């Protein structure tokens, strides 16, 4: 798919894309209780989660209603994923808790991602692995209710272990510092507690005392990280937008912190009663921000930094190298295509903002990374541009291009 973008000014109201992080967690909750998700958007990552719980015995009706099995067991000995890192990393400890043997594989982008920390951890507790990368055969059953794991590679392992210890009727997790993307662990803890469980997270330890979980019927709330590209598009293009279907921002740093970050850079950016109000200003300020706890915000911040006055610095970026693409290099390349300079350091990237009228009109290959396409499309709204392999947005937000059209973006889709 090729998308041609012409100079446009974004305006209007848009519904935030459903949070795939929340959708995947809700789908995995169907291992324990009945879940009915209204109007579920079937992104590639969500489909990976659906196929995973189906392989563990969950009955799935119309890709929206999920009924837990009477007994959890591995129904399929081979689980093939597409590209969902969240699903993969949560699935590994879950199948280890259920016990048995299963082989997991995925597309090349996911095969490149490291699994070292979860393999190291679970190998100490009765689990055998064929390797530390995909394809991966997992054999055995967790022999302990008290798990130690390094927290530097991915928070998704810890989220998966919270599910695993619910399967085992309780236990504890000790996370060896540093703890990366802590906000996503807090999301999992909050979700279980909201459904009736008893999960405590203090310092670097999590204690799980399961209770019967309540059923859920409703729609998946919006995703601040994905919605931020609509905000970025409005700010870059000189427009305004209102984004609805968003939960109130939490106090801890996470994807929702983008509301405050954009405001600190000079934009009108306010949350009120489930709506995020965004309006462009004539100029924006540079910023220094650590995104280790919310790495998915990197490209939105980089996009606005490209046209901000001065030099911005995004730190805590080390794990961006193991996303759908090497996102540090992707940010550098995309900014360079638009004529924006940047400098990569060991754990940070400097972005040298320019006047937006000086932005180029390049052709951008999205590198099979949905966020590359979204960042580039926002910058292209100033002087135009072309996105190739633009179908990559289907990984998280299949409606992205249609949403831009509804916000008055001038684009053609080939």
Curated annotation (Swiss-Prot):
Output the Gene Ontology cellular-component terms. cytoplasm
**A molecular-function term among this protein's GO annotations:** 3-phosphoshikimate 1-carboxyvinyltransferase activity
Q: Where does 3-phosphoshikimate bind?
A: 20-21, 25, 154-156, 181, 296, 323
List the active-site residues. 296
GO biological process terms, alphabetically, are: amino acid biosynthetic process; aromatic amino acid family biosynthetic process; chorismate biosynthetic process
Subcellular location, principal: cytoplasm
Biological pathway: Metabolic intermediate biosynthesis; chorismate biosynthesis
User: What highest taxon heads this organism's lineage?
Assistant: Archaea
Q: What is the annotated localization of this protein?
A: Cytoplasm
Q: Where does phosphoenolpyruvate bind?
A: 20, 85, 113, 156, 327, 371, 395
Enzyme class, one word?
transferase
EC assignment: 2.5.1.19
**UniProt keyword terms in alphabetical order:** Amino-acid biosynthesis, Aromatic amino acid biosynthesis, Cytoplasm, Transferase
Show the catalytic activity: 3-phosphoshikimate + phosphoenolpyruvate = 5-O-(1-carboxyvinyl)-3-phosphoshikimate + phosphate
One Pfam entry name: EPSP_synthase
- PROSITE patterns annotated for this entry? EPSP_SYNTHASE_1, EPSP_SYNTHASE_2
Among SUPFAM superfamilies, the record links this protein to: EPT/RTPC-like (SSF55205)
Assembly and interactions? Monomer.
Summarizing the function annotation, the protein's role is: Catalyzes the transfer of the enolpyruvyl moiety of phosphoenolpyruvate (PEP) to the 5-hydroxyl of shikimate-3-phosphate (S3P) to produce enolpyruvyl shikimate-3-phosphate and inorganic phosphate.
Q: Which family does it belong to?
A: Belongs to the EPSP synthase family.
- Matching PANTHER family, A to Z? AROM/DEHYDROQUINATE SYNTHASE, PENTAFUNCTIONAL AROM POLYPEPTIDE
Q: Mind telling me what this protein is named? A: 3-phosphoshikimate 1-carboxyvinyltransferase
Q: Which organism is it from?
A: Saccharolobus islandicus (strain L.S.2.15 / Lassen #1) (Sulfolobus islandicus)
């Amino acid at each position: 798919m090729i998308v041609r973008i012409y100079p446009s000014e974004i305006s209007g109201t848009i519904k935030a894309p459903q949070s795939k992080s929340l959708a995947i967690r809700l789908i995995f909750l169907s291992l324990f209780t009945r879940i009915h998700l209204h109007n579920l958007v079937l992104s590639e990552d969500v489909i990976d989660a659906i196929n995973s719980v189906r392989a563990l015995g969950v009955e799935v009706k119309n890709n929206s209603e999920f009924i837990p099995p009477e007994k959890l067991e591995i129904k399929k000995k081979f689980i093939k994923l597409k590209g969902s890192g969240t699903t993969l990393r949560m699935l590994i400890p879950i199948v280890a808790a259920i016990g048995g043997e299963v082989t997991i594989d995925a597309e090349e982008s996911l095969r490149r991602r490291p699994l070292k920390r979860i393999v190291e951890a679970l190998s100490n507790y009765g689990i055998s692995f064929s390797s530390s990368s995909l394809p991966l055969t997992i054999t055995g059953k967790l022999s302990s209710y008290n798990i130690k794991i390094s927290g530097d590679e991915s928070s998704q392992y810890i989220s998966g272990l919270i599910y695993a210890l619910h399967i085992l009727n309780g236990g504890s997790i000790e996370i060896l510092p540093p703890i990366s993307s802590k906000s996503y662990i807090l999301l999992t803890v909050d979700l279980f507690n909201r459904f009736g469980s008893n999960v405590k997270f203090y310092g670097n330890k999590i204690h799980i005392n399961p209770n019967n979980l309540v059923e859920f019927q409703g729609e998946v709330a919006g995703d601040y990280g994905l919605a931020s590209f609509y905000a970025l598009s409005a700010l870059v293009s000189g427009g305004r937008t209102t984004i609805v279907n968003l939960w109130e921002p939490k106090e801890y740093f996470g994807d929702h912190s983008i509301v405050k970050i954009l405001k600190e850079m000079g934009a009108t950016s306010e949350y009120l009663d489930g709506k995020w109000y965004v309006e462009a200003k004539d100029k924006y300020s540079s910023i220094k921000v650590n995104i280790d706890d919310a790495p998915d915000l990197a490209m939105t911040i980089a996009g606005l930094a490209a046209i901000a006055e001065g030099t911005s610095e995004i730190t805590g970026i080390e794990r961006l190298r193991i996303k759908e693409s090497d996102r540090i290099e992707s940010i550098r390349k995309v900014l360079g295509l638009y004529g924006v300079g940047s400098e990569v350091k060991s754990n940070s990237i400097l972005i040298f903002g320019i006047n937006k009228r000086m932005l180029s009109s390049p052709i951008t290959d999205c590198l099979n990374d949905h966020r590359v396409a979204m960042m580039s499309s926002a910058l292209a709204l100033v002087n135009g541009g072309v996105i190739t392999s633009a179908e990559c947005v289907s990984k998280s937000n299949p409606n992205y291009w249609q949403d831009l059209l509804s916000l008055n973006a001038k684009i053609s889709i080939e």
